[in-house]
């Protein structure tokens, strides 16, 4: 009897299985049921014990918090020095390959330097699901208990005191000792600093000085072993590297105080203009160097050191790091300004250390083998200097791309490519060595290829290219529920698609880049009236809209019929590829 009952129950369960998808469709597709509300994905708690405040997040499995999106804003209170946990590295196509995230749990201990009875701390965080679903930034205001102001204390290398400031437009402001949003995806590896340092060694201001510097650090001691010569040269280079390393750490530490400001368009444009001026100095438009009086004072101080001794050579190298010749000032200033945006002390110090080592490698070779290894001076040295001018010009293009957008960024990169390869083409025409003509042909071809985006912008893209790649869909922007209702009423008998978008939503950008531009998707979307609500700023009116539409995160796409009613089971949450999205649209508008 028991076996018969078990068999009947099993048959009943198997019979109901095909009905489960149909019942699930009544409440939305399976794509939308797999995500939990933000308060469940990231359970936040806090505890204050005297002058110590602990913030903790319990992160649900399969979800993560962005380190760069954690923002702390004290109100009528002062926070002491602290650091955020390093987190784990995460590959992100749009934020960069080296984004720091937190999984499972996060605990932050904050020292309170001063607080009153009415003091508060605004804590903001933002995270996503591994499956491709992002939540809007969450903010919680924490009441603080009053404590007496503590005497000021210095900050260490690994920490910084916070200065409360309002977040910039777009919700990307960061007030924390963590790197800014683009700190980890700067298109600049520290190894590039090594190559730049080696290249700077072959500029007309630096290369002729190496034999003289080699003689100075070795002194009058002619009978030195190879090991001793190598040791003296390395000690000199390490002394120079120490100066540059400390300079990089100091610049990064200063940049920590202004990370939110470093994301402002006005400052990005100003930095881009400064980089352009530095590049012009490399092209010989003007000369940039330390005042001659300061250089003379440093030279006299260096000459007082004992030549041929390890301490004296080390001090000479450290002082040499302060000399800025016309050829080194511009690249060094560009690197310093660039790494100031990272706020990462170790990254900045290591970058400048590699830069100094790169400059010192030719010096070590000269000390060991003499000046015979050095190439002869000539016009090629000036060409090396000009080449670094183009390297510096890449930095303002990167900065302006954030302000002007991807389209103008592509045009600026195209313009830089045309200028660089065109310059290389002219140099190859003037060269007389074998193979220069073939290299000139290659440079000409690269110039024409680089000019393609500019050509498409000025004269329009070819029709066959447009039809192959698919044009970007045109959405009608909406911000409030009233505007959405008005657009639904005005829809000309067509179903309506409402896309909820934000810049901090990675999957939203994947939709825009991969799905919406697919030709089959574009064809199906033409049957819909397209609306889009940009909630990047996470303003109160935008949070109200998300609440009214019962949206817990992005990307979320809603579909309405021609009468303005949301189509049951049509709502999408999370990323969907072009093929699946096309099939979904065909079901809604066959």
From Swiss-Prot:
Main location class: membrane
Enzyme Commission number, as recorded: 1.8.1.8
Domain annotation Thioredoxin: ranges: 457-590
Membrane topology value: Multi-pass membrane protein
This protein's record includes keyword Signal: yes
Enzyme class: oxidoreductase
Localization, UniProt: Cell inner membrane
Catalytic reaction annotation: [protein]-dithiol + NAD(+) = [protein]-disulfide + NADH + H(+); [protein]-dithiol + NADP(+) = [protein]-disulfide + NADPH + H(+)
Transmembrane segments: 193-213, 229-249, 266-286, 310-330, 349-369, 388-408, 409-429, 438-458
GO biological process: cell redox homeostasis; cytochrome complex assembly
Gene Ontology molecular function, alphabetical: electron transfer activity; protein-disulfide reductase [NAD(P)H] activity
InterPro entries on file: Cyt_c_assmbl_TM_dom, DsbD_gamma, DsbDN, DsbDN_sf, Thiol_diS_interchange_DbsD, Thioredoxin-like_sf, Thioredoxin_CS, Thioredoxin_domain
Covalent S-S links between cysteines: 128-134, 205-327, 505-508
Name recorded for this polypeptide: Thiol:disulfide interchange protein DsbD
Taxonomic lineage: Bacteria, Pseudomonadati, Pseudomonadota, Gammaproteobacteria, Enterobacterales
Gene: dsbD
